[in-house]
């Protein structure tokens, strides 16, 4: 049975989702979780895009030990050399070079002839191969490319040294039958086909990204590309967790097994959702809140008698816990540390102490601490520790009618303390106005969302905000049992990012 490898592009293609803006620390958190998920290749970013992207890719490359780290590059020497500088420190570095091959792209975007495109492919892959042990070539807009020319371009790339050939459905145009036949066509028409691994990369514009990816596997693809939760530009990418579980459950049909640690799927999905602020729909396959819920009386009766009557996936397969009690206020530092290690977290003594302190505070107010609570605490404290500013004091007072007054005290990384107060028509508006006064911002609150992480009156709150000032838009999140504290943390998280961006462009 063939093993299907996964190339995750959450950190590059996924981050291109409108409204998503991850900082370096957040990208590193996701990269570490992708490593736990067993992802074979992670596309850490586009190193030549900006200095920030370069530094993020470089840090991930120097950190990850058990996965290939890849940078995207155009078919340009400067891009390729920049990608090399970013990932050369990786245990397993890879270059991902791309060039469009469809008539519409060659005519209107590239203004290049077919001969020019073939020459550029050969030169860029040859250069890449002189620097990297592994080179992946993508024929952008492959599914709208004339098949004979696509086969010619692929052959040129393989002869130049490409180890992996990606056939992307860049605009989500194809369907499963067409995509399957395209892979079969290339198998028959590319003389050097056996010298490379073929990969698929599907977008979801027509809602067929997962189905198309599975069809590609049937057609001979050995690598599937996509993102966690299917996030990405426009309608998004193929959701890797859906492809992986489909291959596992229907290995009898696909004759393939996913190379992924499936029990880490839920934790990965939750992390990506909270850091990006993109809420997972309740009815989403595999990771949605209702994925394993049954309301129909007939269904409930069947499941109680025999679970396989209406469930084809065991929740535990993807790491869906039953949210059972795991720790309490009497749990000590050692038990806490061991449980966090069991969940896959590694941290320094200082980081452990900060999260343990937050855990003890929560345990004093919450009778049962679940795995979801622990993950949320770890996420929240990691974000809090990485911020330019942290909240040291927060007070809200009723003034009159609906007017509230908030006093906020912030401390920066150098230990400087800032305090200010402001009013607003409600507690949250007052808090946000006070924070704006401290940071000297005049931004617009573009989005505010609150989620309960676990059930019950003592549940942790997760608040996501998006701030906009001029052309700059950033997101932030905060986790706390108190909604006002979570809201303040989220605003400080986002406002700190926004201030950094504004200072950078100045």
From Swiss-Prot:
Database matches in Pfam families: HCS_D2 (PF22617), HMGL-like (PF00682), LeuA_dimer (PF08502)
GO MF assignments: 2-isopropylmalate synthase activity; acetyl-CoA C-acetyltransferase activity; manganese ion binding
Localization (cell): Cytoplasm
GO (cellular component) term, any one: cytoplasm
Catalytic activity, reaction form: 3-methyl-2-oxobutanoate + acetyl-CoA + H2O = (2S)-2-isopropylmalate + CoA + H(+)
Enzyme Commission code(s) on record: 2.3.3.13
Disulfide bonds listed in the record: none
Pathway the protein acts in: Amino-acid biosynthesis; L-leucine biosynthesis; L-leucine from 3-methyl-2-oxobutanoate: step 1/4
CDD domains: DRE_TIM_IPMS
Main location (coarse class): cytoplasm
Record note on quaternary structure: Homodimer.
Record-stated family: Belongs to the alpha-IPM synthase/homocitrate synthase family. LeuA type 1 subfamily.
Protein's name according to its UniProt entry: 2-isopropylmalate synthase
Organism of provenance: Bacillus cereus (strain 03BB102)
């Amino acid at each position: 049975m063939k093993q299907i490898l996964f190339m995750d592009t959450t950190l590059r293609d996924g981050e291109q989702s409108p409204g998503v803006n991850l900082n370096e620390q957040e990208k590193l958190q996701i990269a570490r979780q992708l490593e736990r998920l067993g992802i074979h290749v992670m596309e850490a970013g586009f190193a030549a895009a900006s200095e920030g992207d370069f530094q993020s890719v470089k840090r991930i490359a120097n950190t990850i030990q058990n996965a290939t780290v890849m940078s995207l590059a155009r078919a340009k020497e400067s891009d390729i050399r920049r990608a090399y500088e970013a990932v050369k420190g990786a245990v397993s570095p890879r270059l991902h070079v791309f060039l469009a091959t469809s008539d519409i792209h060659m005519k209107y975007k590239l203004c290049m002839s077919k001969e020019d495109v073939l020459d550029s492919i050969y030169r860029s892959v040859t250069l890449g191969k002189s620097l990297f042990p592994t080179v992946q070539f993508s024929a952008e807009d492959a599914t709208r490319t004339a098949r004979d020319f696509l086969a010619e371009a692929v052959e040129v790339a393989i002869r130049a040294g490409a180890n992996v050939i990606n056939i992307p459905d860049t605009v989500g145009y194809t369907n499963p039958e067409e995509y399957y036949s395209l892979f079969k066509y290339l198998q028959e028409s590319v003389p050097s086909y056996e010298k490379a691994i073929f990969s698929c990369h599907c977008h979801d514009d027509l809602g067929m990204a997962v189905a198309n990816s599975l069809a590609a596997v049937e057609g001979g693809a050995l690598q599937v590309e996509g993102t966690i939760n299917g996030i990405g530009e426009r309608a998004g990418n193929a959701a890797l967790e859906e492809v992986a579980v489909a291959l596992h459950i229907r290995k009898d049909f696909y004759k393939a097994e996913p190379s992924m640690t499936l029990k880490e799927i839920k934790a990965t999905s939750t992390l990506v959702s909270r850091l990006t602020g993109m809420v997972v729909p309740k009815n989403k396959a595999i990771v949605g809140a209702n994925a394993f819920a049954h309301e129909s009386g007939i269904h409930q009766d069947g499941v109680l008698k025999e679970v396989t009557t209406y469930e084809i996936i065991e929740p535990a397969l993807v790491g869906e816990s039953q949210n059972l009690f795991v720790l309490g206020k009497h749990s000590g530092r050692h038990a806490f540390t061991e449980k966090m290690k069991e969940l896959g977290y590694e941290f320094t003594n200082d980081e452990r102490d900060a999260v343990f302190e937050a855990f003890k505070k929560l345990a004093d107010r919450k009778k049962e601490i679940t795995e979801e609570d622990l993950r949320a605490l770890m996420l929240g404290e990691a974000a809090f520790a990485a911020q330019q500013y942290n909240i040291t004091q927060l007070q809200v007072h009723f003034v009159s009618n609906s007017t509230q007054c908030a006093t906020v005290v912030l401390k920066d990384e150098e230990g400087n303390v800032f305090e200010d107060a402001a009013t607003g028509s409600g507690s949250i508006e007052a808090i946000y106005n006070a924070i704006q006064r401290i940071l000297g911002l005049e931004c617009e609150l573009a989005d505010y969302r609150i989620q309960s992480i676990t059930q019950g009156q003592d549940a942790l709150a997760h608040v996501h905000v998006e701030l906009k000032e001029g052309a700059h838009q950033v997101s932030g999140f905060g986790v706390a049992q108190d909604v006002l504290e979570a809201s303040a943390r989220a605003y400080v998280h986002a406002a700190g990012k926004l201030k950094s961006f504004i200072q950078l462009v100045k």
